Curated annotation (Swiss-Prot), chain A:
GO cellular component, one term: protein farnesyltransferase complex
Subunit note: Farnesyltransferase and geranyl-geranyltransferase share a common alpha subunit (RAM2). Protein farnesyltransferase is a heterodimer of alpha subunit RAM2 and beta subunit RAM1. Protein geranyl-geranyltransferase type-1 is a heterodimer of alpha subunit RAM2 and beta subunit CDC43.
Outcome when changing H145D: Increases KM for peptide substrate 4-fold, but retains catalytic activity
One Pfam family here: PPTA
Localization in the cell: Cytoplasm
Protein known as: Protein farnesyltransferase/geranylgeranyltransferase type-1 subunit alpha
Entry keyword annotation includes Phosphoprotein: no
UniProt function note: Essential subunit of both the farnesyltransferase and the geranylgeranyltransferase complex. Contributes to the transfer of a farnesyl or geranylgeranyl moiety from farnesyl or geranylgeranyl diphosphate to a cysteine at the fourth position from the C-terminus of several proteins having the C-terminal sequence Cys-aliphatic-aliphatic-X. If X is Ser, Ala, Met, Cys, or Gln, then the protein is farnesylated, if X is Leu or Phe, then the protein is geranylgeranylated. The alpha subunit wraps partly around the beta subunit forming part of the active site.
Encoding gene, per UniProt annotation: RAM2
Further remark: Present with 396 molecules/cell in log phase SD medium.
Gene Ontology biological process terms, A to Z: peptide pheromone maturation; protein farnesylation
Keyword Isomerase assigned: no
Family classification: Belongs to the protein prenyltransferase subunit alpha family.
Co-factor(s): Mg(2+)
Length: 316, 376
């Protein structure tokens, strides 16, 4: 790390020990020194290499300081225009940001800062973003900011080609990863004008295979319903899906509704709920829906019994 | 609160008060990173104390002068010399020739001043027009959403900041506190139609709100509270409302029925979370989501208490995440209590008791008093 000289900067020291202060913080000497300098340089709007270095040090101690990101961006934009190789300069900034990202997984400013850099970049590349995305998802496979950023990249680069395979890999690792499941929906919503019937049939098979593996998993069932509604005008597969869902509920529909102990276990309450929703939409199968909701209330998902009774009321 | 009809209360009220009080006192240097958002610490503490019936205006009234110092007004360098104003989170952020006010610190400060009953401030000192103008400048003209701060030099909406439903909520809540009620009131400062369009674009396929179709209880609460403050909940279709109620109730973790099959297989499932709420599908329950989910449900249906059997979530909070030794609430049963989860855990309990204004996240009685006294 290069050493910069700040000796000519007159710091704007932070006031401490104020009267009637709430949540007084015992600042370290280092924090006071850094903030004193940063306040002075921001106030002067000095756009220089040493100011850039200082922002890195501030981000290290206070990554939530929104103005410092803004300041850093203005410095980068200014110095980029003075540098001989803009691409190289911005890539170096992205490299720096990768390191900061790894150390601050929950900070959200990082991601919008990254977006600003890519918008500034003359030749941005999705491929360059993949390693940091991978590291962050390996660390926390459901990190909302990281997933949102990945989706932003897909839209920014208009590139969705790797998304289904990527989501499949993550579902392979953890079949309960809801972020990966909703990523598939994101894919279809944004790619839906260019997809074939074969692809849709493959996707349906993918969902059914995963449900077969673990029937009691809310994510693929929710996704299945959304997927079906999204493409309801494109493919007729209602009976196939209904037959499939029925295989997870045994013969409970034909049994009398008695006490919970008399009812057998079934493999999936979500299958039963899926069927109830489907049956409820058609007056001819409404009785089945009422029975399915009653079974959910009595035995298979009793914590939501008042919801199931509410659904029955809606049907009547 | 939560006083059982017989027997002692399960809520360790005194410990909670002490917990919140501690956060308003001297904090170790490990809190330096939160210095920029110190108004958040103040808000969570004062809100927590108010929930536990501490007379905060008497106890902390002496600090109003220091609080007021965080309000910064800037005259812009334009032809009309218009002014904008708002709050910084900490005086460290008050930098000459740089605009550093932001929306979250502004809302946290305003709500704290309301709880401290500094009505004189609202009636005579706070410049509501310039404050609303600051909010207005945070709106993105292209999307209708809000960023949280302005470029420190140009005073245009920051191009480095993110925009999302949280900041939309905060923007609208600030305007509401400034007296905006009707659509015309809001339209004076922001493009309400465009904002509504943005909120509607964040609806997810199977109900609830989130970015790019991944529903999230926190964003759902922000979206619904915003719509409520804009008197626009009826913009949502009946199907979407029903789907959202269903989605929210599914966030209540259960150890019964088929759900117990998950205990061996799902790494993010714990049977002992029974009754608590999670933020998204297949995640552990977490104290704060009890508030986000309950607040959302309460905005959508008058039957919310019956639908989610509030005694179950009360048990989850009191038996699993309440810290009986230190006071406060933790995120889950493993971690120590933290301020954010302590405030929201307490808020969830107060909401169940009908004593809490969920849209503004302060006790209802305090808001009623404020509305009575300060009608602008
Ligand atoms: Zn939480």
């Amino acid at each position: 790390m290069e050493e910069y000289d700040y000796s000519d900067v007159k710091p704007l020291p932070i006031e401490t020990d104020l009267q009637d202060e709430l949540c007084r913080i015992m600042y370290t000497e280092d924090y006071k020194r850094l903030m004193g300098l940063a306040r002075a340089l921001i106030s002067l709007n000095e756009l220089s290499p040493r100011a850039l270095q200082l922002t890195a040090e501030i981000i290290d101690v206070a990554p939530a300081f929104y103005t410092i990101w803004n300041y850093r961006f203005n410095i980068v934009r200014h110095m980029m225009s003075e540098s001989e190789d803009t691409v190289l300069y911005l890539n170096k900034e992205l490299d720096w940001l990768d390191e900061v990202t790894l150390n601050n997984p929950k900070n959200y400013q990082i991601w919008s800062y990254r977006q600003s850099l890519l918008k500034l970049h003359p030749s941005p590349s999705f491929k360059r973003e993949l390693p940091i995305l991978k590291l962050m998802i390996d660390d926390d496979s459901k990190n909302y900011h990281v997933w949102s950023y990945r989706k932003w990249c897909c839209l920014f680069f208009s590139d969705f080609q790797h998304e289904l395979a990527y989501a499949s890999d993550l579902i392979e690792t953890d079949i309960y990863n809801n972020s990966a499941w909703t990523h598939r929906m994101f894919y279809w919503v944004n790619a839906k004008d260019v997809i074939s019937k074969v692809e849709l049939a493959d996707e349906l098979q993918f969902i059914m295979d995963k449900i077969q593996l673990v029937p009691q998993n809310i994510s693929p069932w929710t996704y299945l319903r959304g997927f079906q509604e999204l493409f309801h005008d494109r493919l007729q597969w209602d009976s196939k899906v209904v037959d499939f869902a029925t295989t997870f509920i045994g013969d409970v529909l034909s049994l009398p509704i008695g006490s919970p102990e008399d009812l057998p276990e079934i493999e999936s309450s979500y299958a039963l709920e899926f069927l109830a929703y489907h049956w409820g939409a058609d007056p001819c199968t409404r009785d089945n829906a009422v029975k399915a909701y009653s079974l959910l209330a009595i035995k298979y998902d009793p914590i939501r019994k008042n919801l199931w009774h509410h659904k029955i009321n809606n049907l009547n | 609160m939560c006083q059982a009809t017989n027997g002692p209360s399960r809520v360790v009220t005194k410990k909670h008060r002490k917990f919140f009080e501690r956060h308003l006192q001297l904090l170790p240097s490990s809190h330096q990173g939160h210095d920029v958002n110190r108004m958040a610490i103040i808000f969570y503490s004062i809100s927590g104390l108010s929930i536990f019936d501490v007379n905060v205006s008497a106890k902390y009234g002496d600090h109003l002068g220091w609080m007021r110092k965080h309000y910064i007004k800037t005259v812009l360098d334009d032809t009309e010399n218009t002014a904008i104003s708002g709050f910084v989170g900490s005086l460290v952020m008050n930098i000459p020739h740089a605009t550093t006010i932001n929306l979250p610190n502004t809302l946290f400060a305003l709500l704290s001043m309301i709880m401290l009953r500094d009505y004189e401030y609202f009636e005579t000192i706070l410049d509501k027009r310039s404050l609303a103008r600051f909010v207005s400048k945070c709106q993105r003209p292209d999307r209708g959403s809000f960023v949280s701060c302005l470029d420190y030099k140009t005073n245009c909406g920051s191009s480095v900041d993110s925009d999302d439903l949280r900041f939309c909520y905060i923007a609208v809540a600030i305007l509401y506190i400034c007296g905006c009620r009707s659509k015309e009131d809001f339209d004076e400062y922001i493009d309400t139609e465009k904002l509504l369009g943005y909120i509607m674009s964040q609806q997810c396929y199977n109900g609830a709100f989130g970015a790019h179709n991944e529903p999230h209880s926190g964003y759902t609460s922000c979206a619904l509270s915003t719509l409520a403050l804009l008197s626009s909940l009826e913009k949502l279709s009946d199907k979407f409302k029903e789907d959202t109620i269903t989605w929210l109730l599914h966030r209540q973790v259960s150890s019964h029925g088929c759900m117990k099959f998950e205990s061996e297989l799902n790494a993010s499932y714990d049977q002992s979370d029974d009754g608590g709420f999670q933020g998204r599908e297949n995640k552990f329950a977490d104290t704060c989501y009890a508030f986000w989910c309950l607040n959302s449900l309460h905005l959508l249906t008058k039957d919310w208490k019956m639908l989610c059997q509030t005694e179950l979530v009360t048990n989850y909070l009191l038996d699993r995440t309440q810290k009986t030794l230190t006071g406060g609430f933790s995120k889950n049963d493993e971690e120590d209590a933290d301020l954010y989860h302590s405030c929201l855990g307490s808020a969830a309990l107060a909401l169940i008791e009908g004593k809490f204004n969920g849209e503004l996240c302060i006790p209802q009685e305090i808001f009623n008093d404020f509305s009575k006294r300060c009608c602008f």
